[in-house]
């Protein structure tokens, strides 16, 4: 009979549950080590290696073939974000905030931080640039709401910094990503759509004062924006919510004094 000789004194239910536990432990180990292909080895906030690297070892390097002829990517690999960080410790122990040592918006630290992404445009599934200016995107137009093109752009100090000359759209997502603004000196900058408020007669940017618009990182091409440029632009404008706060407060104080 089955189970009398080979498994006469063995519980098959125990075999099943022990096998499941072994499989689950192996799955957890595999998923955790695969998750460590990016972001490891761990570092302190000043860039030095962290003392506690966790219980799992780094996985062996694996090479991925990138789509659209963009080469290969090996992770974990030798590539690292090796740029000077303009921050200084405020305490000896870890976990305390670091203080900027220069202009935090230009240095890209704190709320204005950016990640060293690839300096190439993001592509859609067909290998075309995802984000383009509307003047170069056939078939796109403002179908609803106020068209911001031609409107003046006002900073948080209530001063005019420039005017909107184009909208950059995400082709596959069919949504606006950036406003292209021409400054008073004739140069242009991109503003993230999430950081502007389109009003009936102007575009208001609460994050930046008018004198800070010239510091927005520029783009190399007038018809495309790279992943690195996107991150730098968004970091700079978002950082203004904190670093331009004194100018917003001074404007509010002046308005209150005027009506006092």
UniProtKB/Swiss-Prot annotation:
Source organism phylogeny = Bacteria, Pseudomonadati, Pseudomonadota, Alphaproteobacteria, Rhodobacterales
Which NCBIfam families does this chain map to? puhA (TIGR01150)
Q: What does this protein do?
A: The reaction center is a membrane-bound complex that mediates the initial photochemical event in the electron transfer process of photosynthesis.
**Which InterPro entries does its entry note?**
Bac_photo_RC_H_C, Photo_RC_H, Photo_RC_H_N, Photo_RC_H_N_sf, PRC-brl_dom, PRC_barrel-like_sf
Which cofactor does this sequence's record say it needs?
a bacteriochlorophyll; a bacteriopheophytin; Fe cation; Mg(2+)
What protein does this entry describe? Reaction center protein H chain
- Name of a matching Pfam family: PRCH
Self-association state and partner proteins as the record states:
Heterotrimer composed of subunits L, M, and H.
Report the record's Gene Ontology biological process terms.
photosynthesis, light reaction
Q: What is this entry's stated membrane topology?
A: Single-pass membrane protein
Query: Record's SUPFAM superfamilies?
Result: Photosystem II reaction centre subunit H, transmembrane region, PRC-barrel domain
The cofactor note reads:
Binds 4 bacteriochlorophylls per trimer. Binds 2 bacteriopheophytins per trimer.
- Report whether Transcription regulation shows up as a keyword of the record: no
Localization, per the record, is: Cellular chromatophore membrane
Q: Where are the transmembrane segments?
A: 12-31
Q: Cytoplasmic side: which ranges?
A: 32-260
Q: Indicate the family of this protein.
A: Belongs to the reaction center PuhA family.
């Amino acid at each position: 009979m089955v189970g009398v000789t080979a498994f006469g004194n063995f519980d098959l239910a125990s075999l099943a549950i022990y096998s499941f536990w072994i499989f689950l432990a192996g799955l957890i180990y595999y998923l955790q080590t695969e998750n460590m292909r990016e972001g490891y080895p761990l570092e302190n906030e000043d860039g030095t290696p962290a003392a506690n690297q966790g219980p799992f070892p780094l996985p062996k390097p694996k090479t991925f073939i990138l789509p659209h002829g963009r080469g290969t990517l090996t992770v974990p690999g030798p590539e690292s974000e090796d740029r000077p960080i303009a921050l200084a410790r405020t305490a000896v122990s870890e976990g305390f905030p670091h203080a900027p040592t220069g202009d935090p918006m230009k240095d890209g630290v704190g709320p204005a931080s950016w990640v060293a992404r690839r300096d190439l445009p993001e592509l859609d599934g067909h290998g075309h640039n995802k984000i383009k200016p509307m003047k170069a995107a056939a078939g796109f137009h403002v179908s609803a709401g106020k068209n911001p093109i031609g409107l003046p752009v006002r900073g948080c100090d209530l001063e005019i910094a420039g005017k909107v000359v184009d909208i950059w759209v995400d082709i596959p997502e069919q949504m606006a990503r950036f406003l292209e603004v021409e400054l008073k000196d004739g140069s242009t900058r991109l503003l993230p759509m999430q950081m502007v408020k389109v009003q009936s007669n102007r575009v208001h940017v609460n994050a930046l004062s008018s004198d800070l618009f010239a510091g927005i990182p520029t783009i190399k091409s007038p018809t495309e924006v790279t992943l690195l440029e996107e991150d730098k632009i968004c970091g700079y404008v978002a950082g203004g919510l904190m670093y331009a706060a004194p100018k917003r407060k001074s404007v509010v104080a002046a308005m209150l004094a005027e009506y006092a």
